């Protein structure tokens, strides 16, 4: 039975019939229009309250998940219940009108009495439904019902394509009046209905002063059987389902295919409904919350009661309305009788019908309809209401009977304006503002209280759209504000200044044309140009703005320009204009021709006989000749600059005149225009190709300029980074988009304004760890709150998720216009792409497109790329590069382009498309040009459809959701996939085996990483010397490099690591698809993977953000006892701890890591007693592991995941404890280091064991071990020597070489650090892992720098620079500039100039990787501060020193941090010298504090001996400044001894010079360093031999000691 029903429902005729009443489906009408049919019946009018409020609530919802679908579900939940009741009781739903419906029981007159009883019963049951139904969404849904009975006339009208029907007559008027009298839950009978009904069955209540009555209840006699009574009544209903069909609600559900009937019924249904029925792809396509323009037309007739009379009038009006709407893609949605009149509900902007300038078109149509209908003889009054905004457009009703309708406050406002302001065309303020028409087309009307509309806002009368010359009104619309800068348009103004200069010098005409899309700020540019032009003496700037209407007015542009030139714009009366004109033209034009000017300037010169005989063309020529003479005369007296905004609306005659004008005399014309909608006229083309025309295509604003604009618009000193990213991405650099997004945020009260918090005073918690504000450029401070001395900042309301916000209606409309202009197949492609996300790959798009082949898709994509819907990129690096820079302004040379096309060099459109197809095939990554388009297209899908597509995407992506092939397809969190069952695709055994083989995945009882399966063969001799050890280790690494270079196996990866790209195009989208599918555990898995991956890549901010996403999901999980969830919690805290560690928040980090270990069943002791006990246990375990020769069976994946995570936590814990000075903390640190080793040994994984041994070696060296080689380093080498030279072993060896080199650098064995670092560099360069390779280069550069091996250093810096450019690696570039600053400050030559380094810092200090990377930015700021301190430029010093100070508190035990802090301390020491010299009060205290701080750094376990010489050098300088010669001598000698031991030639040379300087204490002039700086040689001079390295060494800064007498 259900299959049969499905088959019936799928028939086109059944689907069409569902949109129509039985009255039409089974009607037999004559073909003539209008046709009239009369019958008797009972009418029910049901009005449902609450839906309009609900529509308003949903249409203003912030988030994208509160859309049309929820609305349609709730609407139909209620309406379908009413429809079902009506159908069960034999009614026929005639019309749905928004949230009301009209039903008919058509019977013979003698049956009316009984049928009224049935209808009353039906009405009471409808009320009963709403008492029983639960109230949803906080809505109070109630119904009011009116009933009427009697004669009814049906009118059918229309044209050859569309038919409409109306029911008219007294009964129709009565039913509406009855419903209007009803209160909530009332049933009102009209007077005639009360007359005709069976009064004995009905208990009523009288209504004062009315003949209508209110039904209380039915009171049948005791013996009355309603079922029998109902069956008898239904026997008289023609189309009530009975017999075999009694289970059907409607007979029309059973219609057999009938092409003739189908064709006839199609005429009653809107075209977009028929499209949806034909195209099954578009199911649910029409239910939307959509910005539209409503035009409500009401016609009142002279003889209301005569069907024949009003029929012909309605027919005439309908035909005209249809023809007008067709031109502008508007549609009639409903026609019904409304308060004694006939109303047409017309809509512009239905799905698929959105067009540009919709509001203007709607007003044009309204005026046209008004003018026509007012002339129809039988129509007494025409009233039209126009309103714009978001309404619900969708199919409302029941499966078997529904209609496409619009519901919303804007529909109500249009209807109310139409009724309360009769006889005119009215519009609301949104329509008025959005029409872009001059204000003089409108007149504001007095406010009226309108039923059902709380506050409609201002109401305007549209006076007509014929352009009237209102002198003085055509100036540029917007005003220039003195206190507001023109942002991001420096280049555009430069074009003007340059062209202006040419104009003044050559005395030739110049035309400057700015083309840009709407919203690019063209008017703002012209306002600035008008201001600049008027600053010059003897210049006259005439500025006008045109509108769409101007184009249709012949010679309008010249008319307005000439009115301004002649000074008529300031005249208040036509007589004044006439006098002015007479004075100006009397010498140029005979008096008898003055009347030529009557029409054009609205004056009243007497009309001469000669003029009356003159033809129209001759008059125009005379007029043009006169204007030329006037302009020639004016040009002699002053320079004229014509400025025309919206020049695409210049009429053809005006273009022709302008073209002649620029050939005839020197004049400067500046225009702004949107791209021409159609091919411009010949004259416009000629101007564009003129050699004196400069044609500029406006670009967008750059990200920093958008940031500045937002800060200036909001008048704040800073905005949150999240807001900055949202606006930069969402606006795409278009000023209007940025403004609309900001307005939307303000409307939803998302922005909070309060005094900016001082960074150093903020108490750090996890939630504000990355409270990251971005600031405008310094030259913008003048326009923000900073200028007033108040640092007001903008913040976001807590809990808001900007990326999920629904786009503002204004921007949504722009996207809908573009979408609706596409073919249906292209729309489908865009909508499918929107599901994938902002960025997508061609492979995934192809996977989810229904029934497409690759050729079709490539062709469609090429077209969409060509039309700027998508951008395409070859790699994610290209994408990231493009996102940093928006499209800039450029010049178009139309003249040279036209010459090329004449030579046949221009491509045809087909060739261009073919070229684009080739480009799309090469580019696998695409991205929406406008994020708003993606959001808009995404919102068009229904929830179920979204789920299906998200599921498809997830299934496709999860196959690649791991590390890249280069990294052996592993998890970012080791063994993570063993813990959680996150796969959607079920795998058979063959697939599993293939995966094991190709990807390295193994079963749960096996592991991914290599094992220590081979027993140890090699051991170092016990008494081997340090030199022999060194030689053996270096020889081993040399052999490994040779093996890597010469191996025939797949030792060297064919491609470099591209994990970062996978994060963007696979793992992040996959996590988001799972969020959309509400698969929270799977989404959490991938967000944790993302956080871990970004930590590996050094991006703490992104790791924090994705961990935040994960935290939201963790809170939603319910299965708290499961091991997988416990592990996810542990991972979450472990990653939190790592982020806190990287940010220098050690207390928070320790807390998080302890939590993670507790969840992993490895409690870390929290008191000395448990510490002692645990230490004993761990030492025994270590001894057991170290003496264990044979390996037991492999561990399960789940166990390994747990051990790896524990090891990671311990690795961070010992570093945290090492930072603390409390003596017992070193025991905690030692325990953590031993526990890391034990955990790693338990994994039986070589890589993990080697990492732990090297970590423990580092711990011991930093804790004070003084030997060159620690025993665990020897154990590492033994492990390495026993590894087979293949696969992952090379990675382990490269890692070991790098780590050993790093340890040797920290401990001051610089030669050894260089030897090991060089070998690590060679290995990592072969292994093609940029993330590891850059770190090796950074580490290698420092010992080379200290050893003064500049040739090798410069070579390493060259590699580092190449890597930073090819990989777009910001960390490498920042480190490169850090070393360049070091070279200038300490080595005495220039590799890159100070200005270049400073510019890099200015451009990148807000980069999220640098800003949240502990140490590097501190080092850069401190180097700049030291530079300025040496030059005694103290203001600049304070600026950078204060920036560095905020980063000092992020104490992390890393080389970069200590590099940074040592330079920061040098800056403070130089400042102390200034304080002492100026005899500042607190100089002595500052000196003592500084010395303590330096001593603390030296005493710290984690600092590393390599930094001691510099720190002792600074301590010596502080002592000499404070007069403590003895201590100075001690620190100086200690530093020299350490430099000698370590081979630190750089520091040794500087120390020797300082010692010599301080001992001899000669006079030193303040500007000596300035002289040194000015003579610093470049590296090229050194290489060429012009400068020797011995000379370079003398370019050291000598710290001034002329404050005290020589203490020595």
UniProtKB/Swiss-Prot annotation:
Annotated membrane topology is:
Peripheral membrane protein
Chief location bin: membrane
Q: Show the GO MF annotations.
A: adenylate cyclase activity; ATP binding; ATPase binding; bicarbonate binding; magnesium ion binding; manganese ion binding
What are the Guanylate cyclase domain coordinates in residue numbering? 42-179, 293-418
Identify the domain of life.
Answer: Eukaryota
As to how many cofactors bind and how, the note says: Binds 2 magnesium ions per subunit. Is also active with manganese (in vitro).
Known tissue expression: Detected in testis (at protein level). Preferentially expressed in testis.
Cofactor(s) in the UniProt record? Mg(2+); Mn(2+)
What residues does Mg(2+) 1 bind to? 47, 99
Q: What is this protein called?
A: Adenylate cyclase type 10
* Organism expressing this protein natively: Rattus norvegicus
Gene it is expressed from: Adcy10
């Amino acid at each position: 039975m259900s299959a049969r029903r499905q088959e019936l429902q799928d028939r086109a005729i059944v689907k069409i019939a569902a949109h129509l009443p039985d009255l039409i489906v089974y009607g037999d009408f004559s073909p003539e229009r209008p046709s009239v049919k009369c019958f008797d019946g009972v009418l029910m009018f049901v009005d449902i309250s609450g839906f309009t409020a609900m529509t308003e609530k949903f249409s203003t919802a912030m988030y994208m998940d509160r859309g049309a679908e929820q609305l349609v579900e709730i609407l139909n939940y209620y309406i379908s219940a009413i429809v079902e009741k009506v159908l069960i009781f034999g009614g026929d739903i005639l019309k749905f009108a928004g949230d009301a419906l009209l039903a008919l029981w058509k019977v013979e007159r003698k049956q009316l009495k009984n049928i009224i009883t049935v209808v009353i019963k039906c009405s009471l049951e409808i009320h009963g439904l709403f008492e029983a139904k639960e109230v949803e969404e906080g809505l109070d849904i109630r119904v009011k019902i009116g009933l009427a009975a009697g004669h009814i006339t049906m009118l059918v009208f229309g044209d050859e394509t569309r038919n409409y029907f109306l029911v008219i007559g007294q009964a129709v008027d009565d039913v509406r009046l009855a419903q209007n009298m009803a209160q909530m839950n009332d049933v009102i009978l009209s007077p005639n209905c009360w007359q005709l009904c069976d009064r004995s069955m009905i208990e009523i209540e009288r209504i004062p002063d009315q003949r209508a009555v209110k039904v209380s209840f039915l009171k049948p006699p005791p013996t009355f059987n309603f079922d029998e009574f109902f069956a008898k009544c239904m026997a008289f209903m023609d189309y009530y389902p009975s017999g075999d069909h009694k289970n059907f609600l409607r007979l029309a559900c059973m219609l057999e295919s009938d092409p003739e009937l189908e064709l006839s019924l199609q005429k009653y249904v809107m075209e977009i409904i028929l499209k949806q029925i034909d195209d099954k792809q578009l199911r649910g396509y029409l239910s939307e919350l959509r910005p539209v323009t409503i035009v409500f037309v009401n016609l009142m007739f002279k003889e209301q009661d005569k069907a024949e009379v009003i029929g012909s009038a309605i027919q005439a009006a309908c035909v005209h309305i249809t023809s007008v709407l067709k031109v502008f893609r508007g549609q009639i949605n409903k026609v019904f009788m409304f308060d004694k009149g006939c109303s047409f509900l017309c809509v512009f902007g239905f799905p698929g019908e959105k067009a540009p300038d919709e509001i203007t078109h709607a007003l044009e149509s309204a005026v046209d309809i008004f003018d026509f209908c007012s002339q129809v003889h039988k129509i007494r009054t025409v009233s039209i209401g126009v309103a714009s905004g978001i309404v619900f457009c969708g199919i409302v009703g029941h499966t078997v009977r529904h209609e496409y309708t619009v519901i919303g406050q804007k529909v109500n406002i249009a209807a109310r304006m139409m009724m309360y302001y009769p006889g005119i065309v009215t519009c609301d303020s949104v329509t008025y503002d959005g029409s872009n028409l001059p204000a003089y087309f409108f007149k504001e009307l007095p406010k009226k209280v309108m039923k059902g509309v709380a506050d409609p806002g201002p109401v305007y009368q549209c006076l007509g759209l014929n352009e009237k010359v209102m002198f003085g009104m055509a100036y540029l619309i917007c005003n220039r504000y003195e206190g507001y800068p023109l942002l991001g348009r420096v280049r555009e103004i430069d074009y003007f200044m340059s062209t202006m200069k040419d104009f003044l010098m050559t005395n030739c005409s110049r035309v400057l044309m700015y083309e840009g899309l709407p919203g690019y700020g063209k008017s703002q540019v012209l306002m600035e140009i008008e201001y600049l032009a008027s600053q010059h003496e003897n210049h006259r700037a005439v500025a006008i703005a045109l509108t769409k209407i101007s184009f249709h007015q012949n010679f309008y542009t010249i008319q307005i320009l000439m009115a301004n030139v002649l000074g008529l714009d300031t005249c208040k009366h036509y007589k004044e204009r006439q006098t002015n004109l007479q004075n100006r033209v009397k010498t140029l034009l005979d008096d008898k021709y003055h009347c030529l000017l009557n029409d054009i300037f609205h004056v009243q010169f007497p009309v001469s006989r000669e003029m009356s005989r003159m033809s129209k063309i001759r008059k125009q020529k005379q007029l043009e000749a006169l204007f030329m003479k006037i302009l020639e005369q004016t040009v002699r007296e002053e320079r004229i600059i014509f400025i025309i905004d919206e020049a695409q609306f210049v009429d053809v005659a005006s273009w022709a005149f302008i073209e002649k004008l620029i050939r005839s005399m020197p004049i400067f014309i500046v225009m702004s225009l949107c791209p021409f909608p159609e091919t411009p006229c010949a004259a416009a083309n000629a101007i564009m190709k003129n050699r004196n025309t400069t044609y500029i295509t406006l670009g967008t604003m750059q990200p920093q300029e958008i940031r500045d604009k937002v800060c200036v618009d909001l008048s704040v000193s800073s905005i949150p980074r999240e807001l900055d990213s949202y606006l930069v991405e969402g606006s795409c650099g278009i000023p209007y988009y940025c403004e609309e997004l900001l307005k939307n945020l303000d409307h939803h009260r998302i922005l909070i304004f309060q005094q900016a918090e001082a960074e150093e005073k903020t108490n750090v918690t996890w939630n504000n760890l990355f409270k990251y504000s971005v600031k405008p450029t310094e030259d913008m401070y003048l326009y923000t709150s900073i200028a007033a001395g108040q640092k007001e900042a903008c913040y976001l309301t807590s809990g808001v998720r900007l990326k999920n916000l629904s786009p503002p209606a204004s921007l949504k409309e722009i996207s809908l216009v573009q979408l609706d202009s596409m073919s249906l197949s292209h729309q489908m492609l865009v909508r499918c792409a929107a599901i994938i996300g902002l960025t997508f790959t061609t492979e995934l798009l192809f996977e989810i497109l229904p029934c497409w082949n690759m050729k079709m898709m490539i062709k469609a994509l090429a077209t969409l790329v060509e039309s700027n819907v998508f951008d395409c990129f070859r790699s994610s690096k290209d994408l990231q590069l493009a996102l940093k820079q928006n499209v800039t302004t450029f010049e178009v040379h139309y003249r040279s382009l036209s010459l090329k096309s004449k030579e046949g060099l221009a491509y045809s459109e087909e060739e261009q498309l073919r070229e684009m197809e080739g480009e799309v095939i090469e580019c696998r990554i695409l991205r929406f040009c406008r994020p708003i388009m993606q959001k808009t297209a995404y919102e068009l899908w229904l929830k179920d459809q979204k789920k299906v597509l998200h599921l498809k995407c997830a299934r496709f992506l999860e196959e690649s959701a791991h590390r890249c092939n280069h990294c052996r397809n592993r998890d970012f969190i080791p063994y993570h996939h063993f813990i959680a069952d996150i796969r959607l695709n079920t795998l058979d055994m063959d697939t599993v085996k293939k995966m094991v083989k190709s990807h390295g995945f193994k079963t749960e009882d096996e592991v991914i990483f290599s094992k220590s399966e081979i027993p140890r063969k090699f051991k170092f001799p016990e008494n081997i010397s340090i030199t022999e050890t060194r030689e053996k280790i270096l020889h081993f690494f040399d052999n490994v490099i040779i093996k890597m270079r010469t191996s025939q196996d797949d030792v060297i990866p064919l491609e470099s690591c591209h994990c970062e790209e996978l994060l963007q195009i696979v793992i992040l989208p996959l996590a988001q698809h799972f969020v959309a599918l509400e698969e929270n555990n799977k989404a959490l898995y991938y967000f944790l993977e993302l956080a871990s991956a970004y930590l590996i890549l050094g991006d703490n901010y992104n790791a924090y953000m994705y961990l935040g996403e994960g935290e939201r999901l963790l809170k939603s999980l319910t299965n708290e006892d499961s091991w997988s969830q416990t592990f996810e919690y542990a991972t979450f805290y472990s990653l939190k701890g790592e982020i806190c560690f990287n940010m220098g928040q050690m207390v928070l980090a320790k807390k998080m890591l302890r939590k993670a270990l507790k969840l992993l069943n490895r409690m870390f002791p929290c008191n000395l007693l448990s510490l002692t006990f645990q230490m004993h246990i761990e030492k025994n375990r270590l001894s057991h592991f170290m003496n264990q020769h044979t390996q037991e069976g492999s561990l399960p994946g789940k166990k390994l995941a747990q051990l790896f995570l524990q090891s990671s936590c311990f690795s961070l814990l010992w570093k945290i404890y090492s930072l603390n000075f409390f003596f017992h903390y070193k025991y905690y640190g030692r325990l953590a280091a031993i526990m890391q080793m034990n955990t790693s040994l338990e994994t039986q994984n070589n890589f993990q064991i080697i990492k732990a041994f090297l970590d423990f070696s580092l711990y011991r060296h930093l804790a004070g071990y003084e030997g060159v080689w620690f025993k665990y380093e020897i154990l590492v080498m033994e492990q390495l020597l026993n590894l087979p030279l293949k696969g992952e072993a090379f990675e382990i060896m490269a890692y070991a070489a790098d780590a050993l080199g790093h340890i040797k650098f920290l401990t001051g064995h610089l030669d050894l650090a260089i030897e090991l670092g060089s070998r690590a560099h060679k290995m990592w360069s072969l292994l093609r892992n940029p993330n590891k390779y850059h770190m090796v280069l950074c580490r290698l550069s420092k010992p080379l720098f200290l050893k003064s091996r500049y040739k090798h250093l410069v070579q390493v810096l060259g590699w580092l620079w190449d890597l930073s450019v090819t990989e777009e690696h910001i960390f490498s570039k920042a480190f490169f500039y850090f070393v360049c600053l070091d070279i200038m400050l300490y080595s005495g030559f220039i590799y890159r100039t100070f200005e270049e380094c400073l510019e890099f810092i200015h451009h990148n200090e807000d980069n999220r990787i640098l800003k949240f990377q502990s140490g590097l930015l501190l080092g850069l700021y401190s180097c700049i501060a030291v530079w300025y301190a040496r030059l005694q430029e103290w203001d600049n010093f304070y600026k950078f020193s204060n920036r560095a100070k905020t980063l000092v508190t992020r104490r992390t035990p890393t080389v970069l941090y200590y590099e940074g802090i040592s330079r920061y301390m040098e800056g403070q020491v130089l400042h102390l010298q200034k304080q002492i010299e100026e005899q500042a009060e607190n100089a002595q205290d500052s000196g003592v504090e500084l010395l303590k701080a330096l001593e603390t750094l030296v005493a710290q376990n984690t600092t590393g001996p390599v930094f001691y010489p510099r720190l002792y050098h600074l301590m010596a300088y502080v002592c000499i400044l404070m007069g403590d010669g003895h201590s100075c001598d001690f620190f100086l000698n200690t530093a020299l001894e350490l430099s000698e031991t370590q081979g630190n030639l750089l520091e040794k040379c500087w120390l020797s010079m300082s010692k010599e300087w301080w001992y001899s204490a000669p006079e030193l002039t303040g500007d000596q360093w300035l002289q040194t700086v000015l003579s610093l040689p470049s590296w090229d001079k050194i290489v060429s031999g012009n400068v020797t390295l011995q000379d370079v060494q003398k370019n050291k800064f000598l710290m001034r000691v002329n404050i005290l007498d020589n203490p020595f």
